């Protein structure tokens, strides 16, 4: 009986041992399989700070990528690329045309100064400036020339020599003479020629166009509306009109791309440009001239300011649909 119990105990313990070994074996295999799987997955992955995608061309903060074909492209929200090379080329060509007009008008203006034709020079003064005002988004790239042509007296720094349109403006309207304008006139022609020659070297981008259009409206809000731009001649409405024309030209060039992305924005901008132009037309004298800015009432000035501000808000959205 004792031998039987001892054999049973041994067999029982052996059975328990086998069960334990089988369980441990299964657990070990599972653990080993999990470990192998983990290591395999880890081996197939690279650290997060080492991207696996091919290195792309440098991208600027504004989303613009240089391309291999030399054209400008903007990455849109839906991850497609918008080619703006045709638009930037068209805008640059238009500005080059404006520079031709600017030089021609400036030469006529200076010829009147040299001939002592005061009233004729005063009449041409605002018209001669308009091509420059339309083209400021590109003209301002050349920071040394812009102030030489367009600096206001209020913007002069200590010891700075004043030249350009506004220096001549002050003499014509405060001294009522052309005397003292000869050197200023010759310098103005030289500066305009230099600007005209430099325009073809300018790098024109979609961002410059969009930001330039908005800046033209901001300029109206900050200097034209207040009457600070043409403080002596009171010809601010000519500059006002030229700035609107410059911004509208950019909008027109970009319209096909905008139409494909946001047709409602095109409709809104078209209407709001028309509102501003209609308001300006109410202050027109004859076909090409405008009344002196100081003849506008406070309500008329306010109406212009509000129309420009309402135009500026959707105009700034052009960049959103192109990037």
Each model region followed by its residue ranges:
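Gram-negative bacterial Sec-dependent N-terminal signal peptides
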Residues: 21-45
């Amino acid at each position: 009986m004792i031998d039987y119990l001892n054999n049973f105990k041994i067999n029982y313990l052996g059975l328990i041992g086998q069960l334990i070994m089988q369980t441990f074996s299964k657990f070990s295999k599972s653990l080993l399989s999990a470990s192998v799987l983990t290591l395999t997955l880890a081996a197939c992955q690279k650290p997060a700070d080492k991207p696996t995608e091919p290195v792309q061309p440098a991208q600027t903060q504004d989303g613009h990528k240089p391309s291999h074909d030399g054209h400008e492209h903007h990455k849109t929200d839906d991850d497609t690329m918008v080619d703006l090379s045709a638009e930037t080329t068209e805008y640059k060509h238009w500005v080059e045309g404006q520079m031709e007009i600017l030089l021609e008008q400036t030469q006529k203006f200076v010829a009147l100064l040299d001939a002592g034709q005061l009233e004729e020079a005063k009449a041409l003064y605002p018209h001669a400036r308009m091509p420059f005002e339309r083209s400021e988004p590109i003209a301002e790239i050349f920071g040394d020339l812009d102030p030489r042509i367009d600096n206001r007296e209020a913007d002069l720094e200590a010891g700075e020599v004043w030249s350009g349109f506004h220096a001549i403006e002050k003499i014509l309207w405060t001294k009522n003479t052309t005397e003292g304008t000869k050197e200023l006139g010759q310098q103005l022609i030289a500066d305009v020629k230099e600007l005209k020659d430099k325009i073809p070297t300018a790098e024109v981008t979609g961002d410059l166009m969009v930001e330039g259009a908005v800046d033209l409206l901001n300029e109206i809000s900050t200097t034209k509306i207040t009457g600070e731009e043409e403080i002596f001649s009171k010809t601010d409405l000519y500059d006002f009109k030229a700035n609107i024309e410059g911004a509208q030209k950019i909008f027109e060039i970009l319209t096909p791309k905008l139409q494909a992305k946001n047709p409602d924005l095109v409709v809104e901008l078209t209407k709001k440009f028309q509102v501003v132009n209609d308001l300006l037309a109410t202050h027109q004298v004859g076909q090409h001239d405008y009344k002196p800015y100081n003849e506008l009432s406070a309500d008329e000035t306010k109406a212009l300011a509000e129309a420009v501000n309402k135009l500026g808000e959707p105009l700034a959205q052009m960049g959103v649909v192109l990037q």
